[in-house]
Amino acid sequence: MDPKNYKRVLSRYATGIAIIVTKIDKYSVNAITINSFSSISLNPPFISWSLDKYSSTYSNFQNIKLFDVYILSFRQKKISNFFSSNTQALFNSKVIKDLQKFSLAKLSCATIKKYTFGDHLFFLARVKKYKLNSNIRPLIYFSGTYK
C-alpha cells in the first residue's frame, strides 16, 4: 500500500481541529495542533487523541498526564497553523489568550492509558471538566485545507 495515496484517501474525511495544551511551568506551555481528537465515551467521559511517534514534538507530549483540549472555531486558522510548527508559548501570550477566547470548547483531561499503534501513540483520557465557549462555526480540515 502506497503511504502517500493512503494519506490522500484519509484526507477525504473532514475533521475538526483541536489543540492539546500542557503546562511546562507557571509561565509557559507546550501545545500541538491535532485532528485526531475523538469522543470515546459519554459516561464516564473519555476522549482520545494520537501523536505521531516520529514527530519533532513527540518528546514534549509522550509523558503528559494533565492537558487541555481546545476545539477550534473558524476564526482560529492562524492559531492552528502556529501550533502546527511551534510547540512552546508563554502562558500569557496573545496566541494563548486568543486560543482561550475564541475556541468553541475547552476540555481539561487526565491521561488514563497510552497505547502504541503503528507509527502513533494513542492517548485515552478522562475529561475532568469542560467549558462550552461559543456557538460559532468550527474549523474544519478537509483534503489538506481548512474549510
Give each language-model segment a name.
Residues M1-K147:
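Basic, polyanion-binding surface patches
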